[in-house]
Amino acid sequence: MKTGSNNNHISASSSSSNNNNNSSLVQQQQQRSTTSVSVSSSHIVTEWEDGIIFDVDDPDFCNLATDKLNFIVPSAANMSIASVHGPQIADICSPLSHHNLGLSASLPDLVGSPLEISMDNVLTIEELRQHMGSCFTCGVSWTDDHVSLDCSECGGYSLERPCPLCDGQCGVQWKRDFAMSHACSQARWVGVCISYPEVVAGVQLPVGAGAGAATSCAAAAANQLRLAQELCSRLEQLSTSTASKSGRI
């Protein structure tokens, strides 16, 4: 009877040890599977997780190793040069790029741009008259009573001279023809001589130079006079508009 009880005790202990061994094996397998799953999950990145960057101060990931974290380093963004530069003057003057330029630019937008008009580069009416009253050949100012004796455009006189037909015997002072003097680069005078009224036209135009040369010189003078008058009118309009704008401000 004692032997049977011992055998039963041995068999019970062996079965319990087998159960313990089996349970330990199951636990080891579970640990291995968990480890393999965790390792595989740490290496496998799905398309949903690709590109995700976590902050360093995130409480869910603050205990991770620093070598596994992606740090965001702030850097200054470089803007393209083409996005800050305004239109160049070559693009503005080009006829192919006129359709790209709008007319909605206001006055503050034009400040500092190539379209800004500097008042230093605009001639006033007085400056234009001073320019027209100067010799284009030697540069002296006829309006200031300056003259060059060896210049054909000056002709030895500034604004007036005695009658060239009778050498001043009639007492009439002839006035300078600015347009003709500038166009022909020779002194031209306008006046009427009391002693010889029939030769006035011959003095105003060069005698003996031919009808063709006289006609071309007269046409050039008329064209220059027209341009000067047009420029004067534009300057007057510009000065009027500038004065009105300054009054509104």
From Swiss-Prot:
Disruption phenotype: Reduced attractant response to some odorants. The gene is Pino. Residues 1-40 are annotated as: Disordered. It comes from the Eukaryota. Plays a role in olfaction. Belongs to the pinocchio family. GO terms for biological process: olfactory behavior; sensory perception of smell. Expressed in the third antennal segment. Keywords: Coiled coil, Olfaction, Sensory transduction. The keyword Coiled coil applies. The keyword NADP does not apply. Residues 218-238 form a coiled coil. This is Protein pinocchio.
